[in-house]
Amino acid sequence: MSEKINTKPFILHSDFRPSGDQPQAIEKLAENLTDGLAHQTLLGVTGSGKTFTIANVIAQLNRPAMLLAPNKTLAAQLYAEMKAFFPENAVEYFVSYYDYYQPEAYVPSSDTFIEKDASINDQIEQMRLSATKSFLERRDTIVVASVSAIYGLGDPDSYLQMMLHLQQGAIIDQRQILAKLAELQYTRNDQAFQRGTFRVRGEIIDIFPAESDDRAVRIELFDDEIERLSLFDPLTGSSFGAVPRFTIYPKTHYVTPRERILDAIENIKKELVSRREYFIKEHKLLEEQRISQRTQFDIEMMNELGYCSGIENYSRYLSGRNEGEPPPTLFDYMPPDAILIIDESHVTVPQIGGMYRGDRSRKETLVEYGFRLPSALDNRPLRFEEFERLAPQTIYVSATPGAYELEKSGSEIIDQVVRPTGLLDPLIEIRPVSIQVDDLLSEARQRADKNERVLVTTLTKKMAEDLTDYLDEHGIRVRYLHSDIDTVERVEIIRDLRLGEFDVLVGINLLREGLDIPEVSLVAILDADKEGFLRSERSLIQTIGRAARNLNGKAILYADSITKSMEKAITETNRRREKQTKYNEEHGIVPQALNKKVGELLDIGQGANQKAKANKQRGKMAAEPTALYNAPKNAKEYQQQIKKLEQQMYKFAQDLEFEKAAAIRDQLHQLREQFVFDN
């Protein structure tokens, strides 16, 4: 944890070597990045090992990287995979740290003001702080992030100014250290030593860094000199050895030097005067009173405490930006030569473009009715054109790239169509709509007899429900996956499908990325000739691809005519299948079924209670730590259980029962990891 940049190389751990289309994809991607190409696309089919390809590119070029995923679930999967590939390097996780978030809003029609309400998850906050620290300190850093990365973060210049640099032999007064820690928003707690706190015992100061999970630093002073710096386990007190120097980072990204706060207050006062004059001129006296009262209260809080509720709304002044300038984000912490990888780019890119507009609409109402100053509009996510300017060299990764990625990449579309397993894209059949229900019933029975699974996608909720009832009445074990089901329950349903609890899964939009089930040998697309979002070329290719992990994969499209989208999807699937077949023949490869155990593919996002249930269904009961048998169902229950275990752990530590405390710490690690993936 030196102040100098750590230049350790990436070391990739894997039992496999690149095969299929992976070697040429790795070579081409790396070559383009070395040549300075700004945009390229990895067009990788389902099951072709796109993440492994990207990991090889990062290791080969030895450059820091950010992986953007469209949601927390996929971000967690990528994080777990990258951690497995690079156990010796810094693989970090950066997603929204809110368990619950209700932004402030005003509804003019009913004159209703909704206060901001939020619950911050300490574990995710620690991981976010660790991510920015790794970017600032280490070259061997991979940060897996959600679209949260384009939202405003503390100004990196202020953040770096506030750091406390400690060095053995340095002359520094104990009071200076304590005052600096208070500036960094650390709190003194001599009883409960927790993340973001420090304690003092004579001339020894112990600090538990905000970004650390299991290491604290001890400062041993001799008069006004730092005699020794060492790292230790904050729970057991066991030492990890001395270090020559250590840097303490602020407890939050939003920490601001006192001088900057005082400057900001003066600018806020000037804007308040201007806004009051505007409201009086427009005869909006209620709004004038409202903005005066709220802003003056915030100013007083900032003056006395250094922060206020909703301080992010004054971020323009706190970061010293001009009106309309982009807010500082995670991109400002990235090294200039970092690589950006946008996973499932056909979903992620449109998300990035849509964030700004929704946020702007809500804030304009708050400004218009006197709840916020106009400068609050600059507390926002990046606009798409700002994101484009800030983004470093970019690789778009998708099985179905969007028009934007294809246009940006030009001719640099790298195909990764051949799978290492030799599996082919599914065969496609077109059958008439008039027989779709009865034909599907017959196909489902055939697949169930072979212990294979079926995915069925319909156009409407009612049709999905009716079809589920019909199949159920005719003896088919069937479940219906709908939009009200949360992520954890969704993973449990998929797990039950894989385990053979039922044979057919019906849904409206089953193309969601990550729904890869090797046991599925048939995908049935009802009313495939109805043009629209759910039957577009991209949606059809994604849905057909759900059967691509099975040796007997087939897709049946029920249609009375062939639409342009169907034609393009069929042509593309056949192109891939021909290329895969030719490669297999040339290299003597026999397609192999994907025989991964259920646990291997679905450990992420699954609670321990589901694990126990699955083991029981297989006639076994695994011994899990006691605390995890009744796994929490939601974020609130997780927090309660974590706090309860922490209290027990600290109690054992105070009573010097370190073995018991360490056992509970292991349970906490498991529970926190499970929480990250479940949420």
From Swiss-Prot:
Keyword Nucleotide-binding among record annotations: yes
Localization per record: Cytoplasm
Motif (Beta-hairpin): 97-120
Origin superkingdom: Bacteria
GO biological process terms held by the UniProt record: nucleotide-excision repair, DNA damage recognition; SOS response
GO molecular function, one term: DNA binding
Residues reported in the UniProt entry to bind ATP: 44-51
Domain Helicase ATP-binding: residue ranges: 31-414
InterPro entries reported for this sequence: Helicase/UvrB_N, Helicase_ATP-bd, Helicase_C-like, P-loop_NTPase, UVR_dom, UVR_dom_sf, UvrB, UvrB_inter
GO cellular component assignments: cytoplasm; excinuclease repair complex
Keyword presence, Coiled coil: no
Main location: cytoplasm
Residue ranges of every copy of the UVR domain listed in the record: 639-674
Residues of the Helicase C-terminal domain: 436-589
Entry keywords, A to Z: ATP-binding, Cytoplasm, DNA damage, DNA excision, DNA repair, Excision nuclease, Nucleotide-binding, SOS response
NCBIfam families attached to this UniProt entry: PRK05298.1, uvrb
Domain remarks: The beta-hairpin motif is involved in DNA binding.
Subunit and interaction comment: Forms a heterotetramer with UvrA during the search for lesions. Interacts with UvrC in an incision complex.
UniProt similarity note: Belongs to the UvrB family.
Record's protein name: UvrABC system protein B
Natural source organism: Haemophilus influenzae (strain ATCC 51907 / DSM 11121 / KW20 / Rd)
Taxonomic lineage from the root: Bacteria, Pseudomonadati, Pseudomonadota, Gammaproteobacteria, Pasteurellales
